Amino acid sequence: MDPSSIDLGSIPGGSEQQQHEDGAAAAAGSPKEVFRSQQSLGLITQRFMSLRQRNEVLNLNEVAKELNISKRRVYDVINVLEGLGYVEKVEKNNIRWIGDNNNSEEQNALEARVEMLRQQEKLLELMIRDAQAIIELHFEDPIERPYNYVSKEDIRKTAEPNTKSIIVKSELDTSSSFEIQVTDPSTSGSHDMIVRNKNGVKSHALLFTNDPPEYGDEEDEDDVKKLSSQKRFETSEALRVTLAEMLTDPTTISSSPKHIKLEEPEEIDTEDLETFVLPPSTSASQSNAPYLPETPGRGLFFSPFKSLIDPCILPSFSDDLTSGYINITTPSRATGAGAGASGQEDEEPVSVMDFFSD
């Protein structure tokens, strides 16, 4: 058939004029187009969901009347919702909502768990900040600085046996970042490791095996451990009287002097007395608790926390050791009415032991 012989006007909607008229009618919002848009499945579902908020059990006949749609379209919506697990049929022409309640309970449980995890995260962040502050204070304390090191034995305890460790040491008080490069062993037949300091700070590297040291017997091992402990802390026997014992029995100091052993301390420059403060665990408000120095032979230590107590507050035992109280005095100042009358101040001590003498 010749295409030119086809009459386009005989085809419904085939002519350009007819198509233009249909488009104009649709644009003007003809009743036919409005009715078809109202019968769309998406719009019916939205209207159907608004009815569901009024009553959990719905009658399909009442729904069809209220929405002014055919019952067939209502069943189309119900079949979709039933397939998704939101509704179930309880009686003839009656449905009940089931999906929303289950999802609500599950959602509430998930939200509660998220809130709990959020609180735990905040707690961990606080703990991390506290730990970082403690570490910073630890490195600032000049008494603790000599002990800021890691021994080979500490590394061997955490490393796998029969392996090797590379220790990189930088200069003190430097923040360095390192990069490690490992070459391809296919060319050289071995792994070549290059450790480079990105900041250009001078560093030293040490390679040692993680094999545990061999001892002849258990006694030798115990002797080595004792010797290592003495060498690390470089202290003799410390004070053995604990705070708990003193609180329960205030006469511990006088009745059990064998527990206390004080060695003659080093002489302290009197100009540095203003920089000595009480240990962090002891404050002027806690002066009623018995005080014993934890640092062997010293009892007082240089600390960056000078601003906590001003002027210099030094503890000294009272004459009555059984009372369990501490006198907080400033040795560099005159004490008592007799000193004021004589116009002379007490001589500054040359040893910390002078503060603990009766």
Swiss-Prot record:
Xref: Pfam families: E2F_TDP
Chief place of localization: nucleus
SUPFAM superfamilies: E2F-DP heterodimerization region, Winged helix' DNA-binding domain
Family affiliation: Belongs to the E2F/DP family.
Transmembrane segments: none
Function: Transcription activator. May activate expression of the pro-apoptotic genes ced-4 and ced-3. Required for constitutive, and for DNA damage-induced, programmed cell death of germ cells.
Disruption phenotype: Reduced level of constitutive germ cell apoptosis on a ced-6 mutant background, in hermaphrodites. Blocks DNA damage-induced germ cell apoptosis, but does not affect associated cell-cycle arrest.
Keyword Plastid: no
InterPro entries with a match to the protein in the record: E2F, E2F-DP_heterodim, E2F_WHTH_DNA-bd_dom, WH-like_DNA-bd_sf, WH_DNA-bd_sf
GO terms of molecular function: DNA-binding transcription factor activity, RNA polymerase II-specific; RNA polymerase II cis-regulatory region sequence-specific DNA binding
Subcellular location: Nucleus
Entry's Gene Ontology BP terms: regulation of apoptotic process; regulation of DNA-templated transcription; regulation of transcription by RNA polymerase II
GO CC annotation, single: Rb-E2F complex
Region (Disordered): 1-31, 331-358
Keyword check for Transcription regulation: yes
Keywords recorded for this protein, A-Z: DNA-binding, Nucleus, Transcription, Transcription regulation
Gene for this chain: efl-2
Name of this chain's protein: Transcription factor efl-2
Organism: Caenorhabditis elegans
DNA-binding residue intervals: 36-99
